Amino acid sequence: TLTETRDYAVVTDHPQEVREILEGFEADWHRQTFAPGNDARMIWCPINGRDRIARFIDESKHKLVVQNERYQDAVILERLVRAAERGVKVHVLARPPHTLKKDKLVEGVGGLRILDDVGIKIHKLKGLKLHGKMLLSDDTAAIVGSINLAPGSFDSRRELAIEVRDPDVVERLRKTAHHDWKHSHPLDLSDQGLMADLEDRQAGAVDRLALGTGSGKTSKPAGKNSKSPVKKRSKGAGKKRSKTAARRKKKS
């Protein structure tokens, strides 16, 4: 982990934050209910995580950097889309689809494609495995913790994050985020790109993404010297399909 993955840790000596962490640990250890209250400084799941992160995104005015393993929560995806549509420059760092768990593959790819469709830039790290969870807004505030942007993390697990505004800490995070983006590749979310990324997966992975030929057999991923039977996905394809379906329905 120390040499092969991108991870983060924040040290705090703020009395309320330290007290919250201790109280949360003791409650969990003794299997008791933990309620930090509306004035909680820490970001807790499954208590206030989704609301706090959604609000953080909503407050971003110019630039938002997001590093996370999973992009699957509908509320957070909507907030990221809204941010892009109001002119915020959004940079998303994600893990390649082939690293996702098999039962999370469709959700994970679907979430990334939603972001891609509104023009959000999505990259993958070179040389490091992305494990850290970090949001950086306007180079002035950040959220660092263990929360994946997925319903399971927000609703079913004990996850913890901290919001930081200390200039020195934020600057270190900014430099790291800048370095990671500079040393990253655009993530190809086209049908051909996904099939190429999944080529090392077991048989059936491509069919689960509905990228096969429709024969019920697994399609061979597109390699450098192979021709894919699937056309490259284009933006706006979903709208064309919807209009075609509507015309058919009207005729019938």
Residue ranges of model-derived segments:
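PLD/PLD-like phosphodiesterase catalytic module centered on the HKD motif
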Residues: 1-42, 46-51, 55, 59-252
